Regions:
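Active-site helix-to-loop segments that bind/position phosphate- or nucleotide-bearing substrates
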Residues: 87
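Membrane-interface helix-loop-helix regions
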Residues: 90-162, 178, 190-211, 275-289
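His/acidic/aromatic-lined binding-pocket segments of jelly-roll/cupin-type domains
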Residues: 56-59, 223
Length: 374
């Protein structure tokens, strides 16, 4: 583990450096997955088809880190203090993502969503809702594609992340390891049933207030976050060489696997998703927690990727909307739009780093002092 980390709190435990790096790799796969939405007609032909599974990896990793950092503090820590810490860690980037989305909204018009017809008052209301993480219903969201957060789509997972942290503060941390195991097994079975026999043949859900998204998104959280907590309790490190590179390669390959089974055999893709969230991702978290960076290059790469992972996840999607509109308006192929795609990825990384250093870290330090988090 690295003894240096970007944190608002001096007493935060050292990070697992490799897990930080793997989180950054997963965030980059999400950006690339979203890029190819501009060319997909459905889940069946989406390139980097399983990039959505990165969210399940994030949830497991979040549960693991929260359990590692806080499970032994509850004798001296109040629920309010924990929730303040999580708010300070998570919410500044929720706000900046919403504001970037609002500023760029009227530049994102295309045949799929005619943003020119949206009143400024509606945009202001949507911005406030996104800032406060209040989800929009399909009939009232301003882009017209059914997202909970039409200015910055990925905010949906932060909505569930907050729910996971609230459940942890009031309930999950009190559970014995045995009871927690039963919860994880039950939720995992529910999510597997949704993946195998649900309407989609995948678990790419949670981003809208529809029945299947609410059920699927809730199951994704209720398995993955407690699974991470459980891992933090039972994990025993083993000696592993090259853990970061093995884990990174695995995440990229798993995300890039094409859709399995087509429209006639949806269960086959559901089985793939189940193997990933139930088996592979917990193993990858254990792999990353077991390994140590042994050279300066890997250490720096992991630190950088870990630093930008959350900002990157929260600032890239307004530019995906813009890219999507450009591709649709100009009827571009991927090859024709490749320079723009490269610029989007590189620009998002730069913006994420700038937001981290110029906004997120200073704001977290300020809020920590103001709210007297020690």
């Amino acid at each position: 583990m690295s003894d240096t980390l970007s944190s608002a709190f001096a007493d935060t435990k050292p990070h697992y450096n490799i897990l930080d790096g793997l989180r950054g790799v997963a965030a980059l796969t999400v950006v690339c997955f979203h890029l190819f939405e501009a060319y997909a007609t459905s889940h069946l032909d989406q390139k980097i088809n399983h990039g959505y599974l990165a969210v399940d990896f994030f949830f497991i990793l979040s549960g693991f880190v929260v359990g590692y950092a806080y499970d032994d503090r509850w004798k001296t820590m109040r629920i309010a203090d924990f929730l303040k810490r999580r708010f300070i860690r998570l919410h500044p980037m929720v706000i900046i993502g919403a504001l970037i989305g609002a500023v760029m909204f009227y530049f994102q018009g295309c045949s799929v969503w005619d943003v020119s017809q949206v009143p400024v008052v509606a945009l202001i209301i949507a911005t406030l809702m996104n800032v406060l993480l209040i989800p929009a219903t399909p009939g009232m969201e301003i882009r017209g594609v059914g997202e909970m957060y039409p200015l910055n789509g990925p905010s949906w997972s932060l909505f569930f992340e907050y729910i996971g942290n609230i459940l942890y503060a009031f309930f999950l941390h009190k559970l014995s390891t045995k009871v927690l195991s039963i919860l994880v097994l039950s939720a995992g079975c529910g999510l597997a049933i949704f993946a195998l026999w649900g309407p989609l043949g995948d678990i790419c859900v949670g981003f809208a207030l529809t029945e299947e998204n609410i059920i699927g998104g809730s199951l994704r959280l209720l398995f993955s976050f407690p699974a991470g907590l459980l891992l933090s309790r039972i994990f025993k490190p083993v000696k592993v060489r090259g853990a970061f590179w093995i884990g990174s390669f695995s995440i990229v390959v798993l995300s890039a696997v094409p859709r399995i089974g087509g429209s006639e055999h949806l269960w086959m893709n559901g089985l793939y998703d189940t193997i990933c969230f139930a088996v592979v991702f917990p193993l990858l978290v254990c792999l990353g927690a077991s390994g140590k960076t042994t050279d300066k290059v890997t250490t720096r790469v992991c630190r950088f990727l870990g630093d930008i992972s959350y900002p990157l996840y929260m600032v890239h999607y307004p530019f995906i909307y813009l890219y999507y509109a450009w591709v649709k308006n100009e009827n571009l192929t991927f090859i024709q739009s490749l320079p723009g795609a490269v610029a989007l990825v590189a620009g998002s990384v730069v913006l994420a780093y700038l937001c981290l250093k110029l906004y997120d870290e200073p704001v977290r330090r300020f809020l920590s002092r103001r709210l007297r988090i020690i």
